[in-house]
Regions:
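Predominantly flavin-linked oxidoreductase catalytic cores and closely associated redox partners
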Residues: 110-250, 262-270, 274
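Active-site-proximal substrate-binding core of FAD-dependent oxidoreductases
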Residues: 346-381
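A conserved FAD-binding loop/helix module that cradles the flavin
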Residues: 326-346
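Conserved N-terminal/central alpha/beta ligand/cofactor-binding core
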Residues: 25-26, 30-118, 151-154, 159-201, ...
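FAD-binding beta-loop-beta segment adjacent to the flavin cofactor pocket
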Residues: 242-249, 294-328, 371-382
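C-terminal auxiliary extensions adjacent to catalytic cores
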Residues: 377-419
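N-terminal Rossmann-like FAD-binding beta1-loop-alpha1 element of flavoenzymes
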Residues: 3-28
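Residue-level detector of alpha-helix initiation sites
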Residues: 10-11, 35, 324-325
């Protein structure tokens, strides 16, 4: 049985693990913290705008397991909020245990608190990876889904310092780039002002610290829009955030809250003293990042170069997924890239032809997005911005599951991930 090791247990790594395991591989997920899903533990937004199409494409391709979980655990469905339609918000406090149960049911080995810090190579082949305590882990194929956030030095250098986010680098150690340890060069995104990286685009408030009126609004509608006084409006934050699909004027002129179990405040950070001056926020307290009044994690600091099969350029048995594989924003994007990486990892290990998704599908078009001169300042997401507009122009924004299945069937790819 082929052995596949996945480094990083976020949404992309989990998606890769499920796909590789269902192709018969022996799969191990090495995650540096004590939780799977990483930023998925504080995200929660699914199926908004073009992400609906991408979710249905994944389901038609055979990668529906994780969407079944997020759909089942959604606190609100079919929600329209500023700039976004038909969104679902999953319960970020319940999703990780459910995903962990799925992996155990499938027989996937989960290695928590296992930070991979080095690699061993023979030419262009990775022969093993080394954990922080010196253990050597061998495999036929490796998949890197370590993300692109931090570590602390980058958040200090290119942000406002460590914000004490869900990744908890001070406790579990910094992210290590496997591609760089293997001798490859990574890319870093740039903001319009030339500063590297981009802030995570939201912070989470304990719902109980909000007024009863706001809590009831969130429980009923799933979101709330609270106008800001002019003196508290800061439009500069919009260009600093990773989530350009939420870099719209309403997100600067208002506090927009989304109910994901926490109250998700759609701003990278917000001075706590100023926040408490807004009606309904007099007792507000941040849950993630703990220093959300000062800053947020800095992302897109370590993106690898890959081909259309998700294979790292320069290494023959390493594949990439999630933010490690491109300037992609969101859980759906992570699941999409990870699913293909996991499937192709199993194909590679078995000596079978790998799959490149066609551009007749939104996922295939996303993976084929080409860099321009300003490519390092661009973000790609099904949910908004430039790429969502491209989806609509190309007729890839399909809102009926039967239309999505028809497009997948036309490429003879129905349930391909399970064949």
């Amino acid at each position: 049985m082929a052995k596949i090791v996945i480094i990083g247990g976020g949404w992309s790594g989990i998606a890769a693990a499920v796909r590789a395991r269902k192709q018969g591989a022996d799969v191990t997920v090495a995650e540096k913290t004590d939780l799977l899903l990483g930023l998925g533990n504080v995200g929660g937004i699914m199926r908004n705008n073009g992400r609906y199409t991408a979710a249905e494409e994944n389901i038609a391709l055979g990668a529906g397991e994780l969407f079944e979980i997020t759909d089942k655990l959604s606190l609100h469905k079919d929600v329209d909020f500023p700039g976004h339609d038909h969104a679902s918000f999953y319960d970020v406090l319940m999703v990780e245990p459910e995903v962990r149960r799925l992996l155990k049911k499938l027989g996937i080995e989960i290695r928590l608190k296992t930070r991979i810090t080095d690699v061993e190579t023979d030419g262009d082949v990775i022969t093993g990876v080394v954990s922080g305590d010196g253990e050597k882990i061998r495999a036929d194929v490796f998949i890197e889904t370590t993300g692109s956030t931090g570590p602390m030095g980058n958040c200090m250098r290119h942000g406002n310092g460590c914000s004490m986010c869900i990744l908890r680098c001070p406790a579990f150690g910094p992210r290590v780039s496997i591609t760089e340890r293997a001798g490859l060069d990574d890319m870093a995104a740039c903001r319009p002002d030339g500063i590297k990286g981009a802030f995570s685009g939201s912070c989470k408030i304990e719902k109980r610290s909000l007024s009863r009126k706001l809590q009831k609004k969130l429980d009923k509608d799933g979101f709330a829009v609270v106008p800001l006084p002019e003196r508290l409006i800061n439009r500069e934050k919009l260009s600093r955030k990773v989530c350009q699909q939420y870099a719209l004027d309403p997100f600067a002129e208002n506090i927009i809250l989304i109910d994901t179990g926490y109250a998700k405040l759609m701003s990278p950070y917000f001075d706590l003293e100023e926040l408490r001056q807004v009606e309904g926020f007099e007792n507000a307290r941040f849950a993630d990042p703990y220093a959300g009044g000062k800053g947020n994690s800095v992302r897109y600091m370590s993106v690898g170069v890959r081909d259309g099969y998700m294979r790292a350029c320069g290494l023959s048995n390493l594949l990439l997924g999630g933010e490690k594989s491109g300037f992609f924003v969101g859980h759906t994007e992570a699941i999409s890239t990870g699913s293909l990486a996991g499937y192709n990892g199993a194909m590679m290990a078995a000596g079978k032809p790998m799959l490149k998704l066609p551009r007749s599908l939104a996922i295939g078009e996303l993976l084929a997005a080409l860099a321009r001169e300003d490519g390092l300042s661009r973000r790609f997401t099904f949910a908004g911005g430039e790429f969502f507009e491209r989806m609509k122009e190309l007729g890839l924004y399909r809102m009926e599951p039967k239309e999505v299945r028809k497009a997948v069937e036309a490429e003879d790819l129905m349930d391909i991930y399970n064949k």
